[in-house]
Amino acid sequence: MAKDDVIEVEGTIVETLPNAMFKVELENGHTVLAHVSGKIRMHFIRILPGDKVTVELSPYDLTRGRITYRYK
């Protein structure tokens, strides 16, 4: 999948799940299941409920995504 095909949206972490998975509520009200990208994992950036994040969604499955950025 090319990088151009992803949909980037902003949301808020609602719940922390096992294996670095999170429930994220998007700005449009939808809830998606998202995992942490490799760069965030590599730099030990902690993500807690209530944090504002950027999520990449695949056009093929809009219920799952990848967290690519945590706002300060």
Curated annotation (Swiss-Prot):
Coiled coil: none annotated. One of its GO terms (molecular function) is ribosome binding. GO terms for cellular component: cytosol. The modification Phosphotyrosine is found at Y60. Keywords: Cytoplasm, Initiation factor, Phosphoprotein, Protein biosynthesis, RNA-binding, rRNA-binding. The keyword Metal-binding does not apply. Pfam families: eIF-1a. Residues 2-72 form the S1-like domain. It is found in: Cytoplasm. Component of the 30S ribosomal translation pre-initiation complex which assembles on the 30S ribosome in the order IF-2 and IF-3, IF-1 and N-formylmethionyl-tRNA(fMet); mRNA recruitment can occur at any time during PIC assembly. One of the essential components for the initiation of protein synthesis. Stabilizes the binding of IF-2 and IF-3 on the 30S subunit to which N-formylmethionyl-tRNA(fMet) subsequently binds. Helps modulate mRNA selection, yielding the 30S pre-initiation complex (PIC). Upon addition of the 50S ribosomal subunit IF-1, IF-2 and IF-3 are released leaving the mature 70S translation initiation complex. Belongs to the IF-1 family. This is Translation initiation factor IF-1. It comes from Bacillus subtilis (strain 168). The lineage of its organism: Bacteria, Bacillati, Bacillota, Bacilli, Bacillales. The gene is infA.
